Curated annotation (Swiss-Prot):
Its cofactor is Zn(2+). It comes from Bacillus thuringiensis subsp. konkukian (strain 97-27). Zn(2+) binds at residues 97, 99. Its EC number is 4.2.1.109. GO terms for molecular function: methylthioribulose 1-phosphate dehydratase activity; zinc ion binding. This is Methylthioribulose-1-phosphate dehydratase. Belongs to the aldolase class II family. MtnB subfamily. Homotetramer. Pfam families: Aldolase_II. One of its GO terms (cellular component) is cytoplasm. Pathway: Amino-acid biosynthesis; L-methionine biosynthesis via salvage pathway; L-methionine from S-methyl-5-thio-alpha-D-ribose 1-phosphate: step 2/6. Catalyzes the dehydration of methylthioribulose-1-phosphate (MTRu-1-P) into 2,3-diketo-5-methylthiopentyl-1-phosphate (DK-MTP-1-P).
């Protein structure tokens, strides 16, 4: 029970911080944190909640299938399946899914992936070589959630990572809440920088074409 309370507090603090950045507009987004590994349980944001508010109903505990562990009238977020795929296939400890203007713009500029390079902040992703290059996959935003989940699952390749969904934000996961938040901040910095650079240069770089 102590672990549940500790993780609830940790997730609540992350929600507060991301809210101050306006990364949950119009109740969008969802975040989760692992509570136990065996059996797998995790806390996830309840569906349709105003994340600028803090209430006792912000999160609910679900199992490896995303089913509530305790009887509740709350519903887990619609994209809970993305979280279950991550937790069931990795040792990740936290998953963050946010909608920002920048990450949505990026998915309209590129088709299957965006390539970013030569930025010092890439080291926040545990990539240390000089002039490092990263590739972030972009998948289509299917309204059929199982199809979205299956396409998403193909890009889960470790205890940390990120996937962009076209016009539907980014999902980032990490070893724990600190790692996940650090990675999310790094990706959003890279997106913002890239878009500003393109606005100065007047075109899409990396050899990619504008996607629509």
């Amino acid at each position: 029970m102590k672990q549940l309370f500790r993780q609830w507090y940790d997730l609540s603090e992350i929600k507060k911080e991301l809210t101050t950045r306006n990364w949950f507009p119009a109740t969008s987004g969802n975040i989760s944190i692992k509570v136990s590994h065996e059996p797998l349980t995790f806390l996830i944001t309840a569906s349709g909640k105003d994340k600028t508010k803090t209430t006792p109903d912000d999160f609910l505990l679900v199992d490896h299938l995303g089913v509530p562990v305790l009887e509740t009238e709350l519903r887990p977020s619609a994209e809970t399946i993305l979280h279950t795929h991550i937790y069931n296939n990795t040792n990740a400890g936290c998953v963050l899914h946010v909608h920002t203007t920048d990450n949505n713009v990026i998915t309209n500029l590129y088709s299957d992936a965006v390539t970013l390079q030569n930025q010092e902040i890439i080291k926040a992703l545990d990539i240390w070589e000089e002039g490092a290059t990263i590739h972030i996959p972009i998948i289509e935003n299917h309204s059929h959630i199982p199809t979205l989940g299956e396409n998403f699952r193909k890009h889960i390749q470790g205890d940390s990572g990120a996937v962009l969904i076209r016009n539907h934000g980014i999902t980032v996961w990490g070893r724990d809440s600190f790692d996940a938040k650090k990675r999310l901040e790094a990706y959003e910095f890279l997106f913002q920088f890239h878009i500003k650079l393109l606005s100065i240069q007047g075109g899409v770089s990396n050899g990619a074409n504008s996607y629509s």
